[in-house]
Amino acid sequence: MAEAHVTKVGIVGIGFIGSDHLHRLTKTVANVDVTAVCDIVPGKAQKALDQQGLTATTYEDYHDLVNDPNVEVVVCTANNEAHYEIVMAALKAGKFTFCEKPLALDAKQCMDIIDSEKKLGRRMLQVGFMRHYAPEYVQMKKMIDDGVIGKPLMMDQRHYNQTQPEEYDSSRSIIETAIHEIDIDHWLVNDDYANIRVFSPKQTRHVQNAKIQDPQIVMIETKSGINIINEVFVRCQYGYDIKCDVIGEEGVLELPTVPQVATRLNAQYSTAILTDWKARFESAYDIEFRDFINHVSQNESPVGPSAWDGYIAAVTADAALKSLAEDGAKQDLDFPSTPAFYTESEKVSE
């Protein structure tokens, strides 16, 4: 491998996750220099830098950051609506790009990104599906591939958030929340989806808008017949709760919970439940960025989740939204074969 050098990174979008990645890239990941930060809100980029005791060039227009010669790699953590245009601009500039999920708002936009990346002749983009790097999911993947529980038959999951603002509507529950399970399930069982249905149980009283459907039940069937159930509840109140059980012919795999110190006090035995994703997947985010930077710092293509993974997730999410709008009607799914551009680039990078 070529000798690594300090990679100059620019971050577009400095909200909650953007600020978290700013800290990660400057304090946790080696061989990185964050040289520029951009946010459309005046003064927000500088405020984030000041809060973390950092210095960098600040911009309000992402075009200025993308075209800055002192930026080699673009990290997109802007609002979902802006992902497409930022990624397209970064690829046009010929720069390695990391884009938080979702890659874009729909499958068509994802395919445009794929076409742009292909024109560059090699992989330049990684999508932030960080669960691929979570040690517990990696272990589950290996055990499934090794046939430890026989062939997978069913999956039972939940994705609960403590709360979300009123503007976090039914579509965002799919595009921003359920998208994680849509992606990771496809990766875990390595089986394309055949159809999807989304149902709405009784609405929680913690939603004031009658048009918002929370919770939701997402049901997916794969080509080989695996049945997947995912409960999505973004206002569960009690905490951030992730569950993944894979039921096979010979046994069951259970995703472990994050270890917490147990307390014996006042005639009670209890353990805490996390309240958000930040602590739950902190190590996955760290490993994800170390891997991404390790490759691009040596001018190598990234090997993590690709634009094609983003496309598969988007096609499925589009169908999920249609099912939700049609009161749970089954939506058939049919994916083209993975382009050789992606399978071959992954083999080369390995």
Curated annotation (Swiss-Prot):
<dbReference type="InterPro" id="IPR036291">
    <property type="entry name" value="NAD(P)-bd_dom_sf"/>
</dbReference>
<dbReference type="InterPro" id="IPR023794">
    <property type="entry name" value="MI/DCI_dehydrogenase"/>
</dbReference>
<dbReference type="InterPro" id="IPR000683">
    <property type="entry name" value="Gfo/Idh/MocA-like_OxRdtase_N"/>
</dbReference>
<dbReference type="InterPro" id="IPR050424">
    <property type="entry name" value="Gfo-Idh-MocA_inositol_DH"/>
</dbReference>
<comment type="similarity">
    <text>Belongs to the Gfo/Idh/MocA family.</text>
</comment>
<keyword id="KW-0520">NAD</keyword>
<comment type="subunit">
    <text>Homotetramer.</text>
</comment>
<dbReference type="Pfam" id="PF02894">
    <property type="entry name" value="GFO_IDH_MocA_C"/>
</dbReference>
<protein>
    <recommendedName>
        <fullName>Inositol 2-dehydrogenase/D-chiro-inositol 3-dehydrogenase</fullName>
        <ecNumber>1.1.1.18</ecNumber>
        <ecNumber>1.1.1.369</ecNumber>
    </recommendedName>
</protein>
<keyword id="KW-0560">Oxidoreductase</keyword>
<comment type="function">
    <text>Involved in the oxidation of myo-inositol (MI) and D-chiro-inositol (DCI) to 2-keto-myo-inositol (2KMI or 2-inosose) and 1-keto-D-chiro-inositol (1KDCI), respectively.</text>
</comment>
<dbReference type="GO" id="GO:0050112">
    <property type="term" value="F:inositol 2-dehydrogenase (NAD+) activity"/>
</dbReference>
<dbReference type="GO" id="GO:0000166">
    <property type="term" value="F:nucleotide binding"/>
</dbReference>
<dbReference type="Pfam" id="PF01408">
    <property type="entry name" value="GFO_IDH_MocA"/>
</dbReference>
<dbReference type="GO" id="GO:0019310">
    <property type="term" value="P:inositol catabolic process"/>
</dbReference>
<comment type="pathway">
    <text>Polyol metabolism; myo-inositol degradation into acetyl-CoA; acetyl-CoA from myo-inositol: step 1/7.</text>
</comment>
<dbReference type="InterPro" id="IPR004104">
    <property type="entry name" value="Gfo/Idh/MocA-like_OxRdtase_C"/>
</dbReference>
